[in-house]
Every structure is written in structure tokens, then in C-alpha cells.
Amino acid sequence: STGKVLVEGFYDDVVPFTDEERAAIHSIPHPDEQMKRELGVAKPDGAGALLLEMLSLPSLNINGLRSANVGVMAANVIPTQAVAALDLRLVLGNDWQRQTDKIKRHIQKQGWFVLDRDPTDEERLQYANIAKVRVYPGYNAQRTPLSHPLAKAVITAVQSSSEETIVIVPSLGGSLPLYLFEKYLQSTTVTVPIANHDNNQHAENENLRLQNLWNGIETFAAIMVMRF
């Protein structure tokens, strides 16, 4: 599978990586093979593209599905509804409202009558396929160019706190409303993660290795006293 989202216009607004950002991606060690072993995945999506390259594209994830019960709770019934939780991960150039509108139009094109509320009895009799789509507010992506003076200053500061060569990644995934700082405060942001890669983020036994904590303290101290 290529992992490509089939929704019309899903990638139209994407601002691609610059040559400098692509060069940064190809200059660092890639964890793809290690991740396949650790996660037990034979073949990831992307048609051979690197994980960090795929982070330059928006994604559409199915976070959860629910219908009738299974296992010991299974019953001889016909489910009256099926529920799916969808998650949109945006990149620079996307607008969360435009993206959700594209999703709704795509569902309509599959033959569904789309509502943002429960259907009336009359609508249930009129339409064979009904989809209730509830959209929760989101926020857009933000990316600071590697060529920005602040990015260069942070890179220098972080490198000064470590004897090892630091890894510079032009973009990471995460639920961080950084674009609000840029939009309303005209401020520039740079993310400096310190967690270990196997920290089970947002899951059971989420953790931070003590050495990462100590290193992080030194890293943030270097950033706090850097000249910019």
C-alpha cells in the first residue's frame, strides 16, 4: 500500500520541504528498519518512502471503530450503527476546516447523506445511507525554516550541550498548537524534544529515561543562555 489518501484535493495545499530540509532528512540516520523490528511490522505504508519524508504529507487515520459487541458479549442482532473516529494530521499549508470539508464531500460522493446531527424519522425513510459527521475544532500546522536565524541559534546551542552530533529534523508530528504563536504573537517557534524514542507516548507505561532528563536539563540551559 502507498498509504495515499484518496480524498479529492487532500494534498493540494501542501507546502513541500525545501531543498535544505530534504538534505537534512537524507543526512541523518533513519530508524525505519529498527521501527519495523520493534513494532513487528513487515511492510509500512509509503511505497518505500522514508518516514521523515512522509511527515511532509498530511494523513488521515482511523483511530477507532465501534459497532456491535464481539467475543462473550456478541449477540444475534443486526447493528443499527457503526462509529468511526478519524484523525487528521496536517502539514504546512493545510487548513483544518478546508480539510474536514474535503472529507465530508468525499463521504457524500460515496453515496451517503451527510448530517451534523441525528437524522429525523423522515430522513431515515428517505435516505438509505446516512452519515452523521461531527467535526471537532483543530489547528493548523507550523514549520520554522532551518535557515531562520532562531533555528540556527537553537541548533548551535543544542550542539554545544552535547558531545555527539545532534539530529536535525525539519518537521515532526504532534498535537502542538504552535501556529497560534506565529499567527497571533508573530513569534517563531522551534521544538527541541528530549524524550527517548521508546517512551510509549500517550499509552501505558509512558516514561522518560533519567539520562534523557539530565541531558534535557543541560540542553535547555544552553538554549536559555544562547545569544540570538
Residue map of PLM features:
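Metal-dependent amide/peptide-bond hydrolase catalytic core
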Residues: S1-N207, Q211, N215
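Extended, hydrophobic alpha-helical segments in both membrane/secreted and soluble proteins
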Residues: N212-F220, M224
